[in-house]
UniProtKB/Swiss-Prot annotation:
SMART domains: AdoHcyase (SM00996), AdoHcyase_NAD (SM00997). Gene3D superfamilies: Adenosylhomocysteinase-like (3.40.50.1480), NAD(P)-binding Rossmann-like Domain (3.40.50.720). It is an enzyme of class 3 (hydrolase). This is Adenosylhomocysteinase. One of its GO terms (molecular function) is adenosylhomocysteinase activity. Belongs to the adenosylhomocysteinase family. It is found in: Cytoplasm. It catalyses: S-adenosyl-L-homocysteine + H2O = L-homocysteine + adenosine. NAD(+) binds at residues 203-205, 237, 266-271, 289, 324, 345-347, 390. Pathway: Amino-acid biosynthesis; L-homocysteine biosynthesis; L-homocysteine from S-adenosyl-L-homocysteine: step 1/1.
Amino acid sequence: MVAAPTTATELKLGTDCVIADINLAAFGRKELDIAETEMPGLMALRAKYGNEKPLKGARIAGSLHMTIQTAVLIETLEELGADVRWASCNIFSTQDHAAAAIAANGTPVFAVKGETLEEYWAYTHRILEWSDGGAPNMILDDGGDATGLVILGTKAEQDITVLDNPSNEEETFLFASIKKKLAEDSSFYSRTKAAIQGVTEETTTGVARLYKMQKSGELPFPAINVNDSVTKSKFDNLYGCRESLVDSIKRATDVMVAGKQALVVGYGDVGKGSAQSLRGLGATVCIAEVDPICALQAAMEGYRVVRLDDVVDQMDIFVTATGNYQVIRNEHLVKMKDEAIVCNIGHFDNEIDVASLKDYKWDNIKPQVDHITLPSGNKIILLAEGRLVNLGCATGHPSFVMSNSFTNQVLAQIELFTKANEYGKEVYVLPKHLDEMVARLHLSKIGANLTELSKDQADYINVPVEGPYKPDHYRY
């Protein structure tokens, strides 16, 4: 292990690592130790597989928010034998003390809170570059940026014109980073792609990208959709957002949520948790939805289902949770009331048309909180520049719910790494018995005791006594 330098500049120049401040490592380790007590699933996997080392030989390129909870995930992967390199999947989501704690133990980590887009793509490249000149054989992704980088870079090796017309600021920096890498090594991406056995994807947005590639025949390796494990989407997306959304709004603005008019755009699992979060603090919550089933669910829960255009001048708080593109556009932004709070809890920053605000007057209040003066003279408060508010303005989901998600991630990595030949170039989900196992590992921590089926009862409903108890198509 290389002796740890003391500044980000030294880290950039001297070691296989980029973090903000190694002096934060002790603080990060204290929080990491506390988080472990709230993450029983990951601790159980360490106990079960620690001696066996099922991930020995795995080289995992991780692109996922560099938080304290992620630090516990990283150390679990390493305990199970993996060699890991890590970057954050969002420019604002890194917790610098978490990155320092991981770096202090010798793991190559490339993550700083408040990265530029140029740095973000440089760091994402670094997780694909092993110090011995080798490549990763596994990707652990959140949002699909690492996977997408490898695939787009491979296309660019054959036809550089695919990088000619970036459609937004993010693509401008992405395309430039690929061109720079190709100038250094013209076959880097194809070699990397050939080495990868599989990818496990954490979030709704990244899963959508995987299914799109599968449909077009462009998916070059097997993928496991971790997001659609029940113990991920129905827990992380719902209960995690229920706690972390209002935490981030309160930290950023200190406003009283009670009595405010709030609009949640999108009523999937993330939207459901967000709506509960705001209602729980006393806001009057409305929902905007395109899906009639989700809209009916919202109405049956007592929310008003409205069109954004009809209420945009009435709302105090706007939250996007759709995974879609330009949901709140300039035509909506300019009509907002004075001091309206605007934020996003979907993965990417393009749910809100932040680019259309660049020519207006911006007044930075504090990191990730901006006052923007509209042509009307009204000011809006934009949080985290339209990126993930719960990680940009707070610390994300609590450790316990992330243990559910990350236990699925570890199981998915083991599955693909140890059984690579059993999977084709498609998107898969973990089998039901593993989903139930993840839930079972978390029950005792919160004092829950399962009832057991008798053999006669199990036979009556035609399930094994030990489960699984529901068919794959069951909707929880």
